[in-house]
Amino acid sequence: MGSTSDPSPSIITVAAEAPVTAERKQNLHLQEQLAKPYVARALAAVDPAHPNGTEGHEHHNMSVLQQRAAFFDRNNDGIVYPWETYQGFRAVGFGVLTSILGGFLINLGLSYRSQPSWIPSPVLSIHIKNIHRCKHGSDTESYDTEGRFEPSKFDAIFSKYALTQPDALTSEEISTMLQVNRNLLDFIGWVASIAEWRLLYQIGKDEDGLLHKETIRGAFDGSLFERLEKDRASRTKIV
């Protein structure tokens, strides 16, 4: 007869016949660190260090995914055009060529799914109210299919892949995560995830080549982009 102190098989997170479950760990104490981490948050990208989301960041009653997309809505009309995506890329520090490609490819890929009708947009507009339809596969699942933020999925990025530092990812760790997250035959999702994470790494890594948890969290709700734009504007004024 087993000891009463032995954990129930129903909550054990490692299976001996599946070594990968030991390699990619879960945070067994997340519920002690953050209230109801299993509940997807509609308005705030939360973690144990930010239980109320990003301080000073306005949600405007948008989902977390909508908040991210709204940064690129430069005239706040609820629609993102390719030239606005370009402007958003430039605002956070990307070069002209990357911004042109981003403006075209992102809007090309997301426009139709976000349209309010079956008629395509000739100018590749993206409607923010329908941005949840544009969620691709092979991702971290930190957004759910309605655009809410999943705290437990976000935390798993670091419990599973942050082996060098607990709250940051190296370039190699990002590559591992991207490979692991690939869904079978989901070529579009593979490419989209690689592009998103490599672009984020380019603008968000520190001098040691680490992409920190706070930087990544800010990318999910768009607050990182707002901060980068303000920092660039401040430097321009000084010059």
Swiss-Prot record:
Written domain comment of the UniProt record: Transmembrane regions are predicted by sequence analysis tools, but these regions probably constitute hydrophobic domains associated to phospholipids.
Keywords carried by this UniProt record: Acetylation, Calcium, Endoplasmic reticulum, Lipid droplet, Membrane, Metal-binding, Microsome, Oxidoreductase
Catalytic reaction equation(s): RH + ROOH = ROH + ROH
Biological role stated in the UniProt entry: Calcium-binding peroxygenase involved in the degradation of storage lipid in oil bodies.
Record GO terms (molecular function): calcium ion binding; heme binding; monooxygenase activity; plant seed peroxygenase activity; protein homodimerization activity
Localization per Swiss-Prot or TrEMBL: Lipid droplet; Microsome membrane
Modified residues (N-acetylglycine): G2
Main location: other
UniProt protein name: Peroxygenase
Gene Ontology CC: endoplasmic reticulum; membrane; monolayer-surrounded lipid storage body
Subunit structure: Homodimer.
Cofactor note: Binds 1 heme b (iron(II)-protoporphyrin IX) group.
Chain sites annotated for binding Ca(2+): D73, N75, D77, E84
InterPro entries linked to this entry: Caleosin-related
EC number: 1.11.2.3
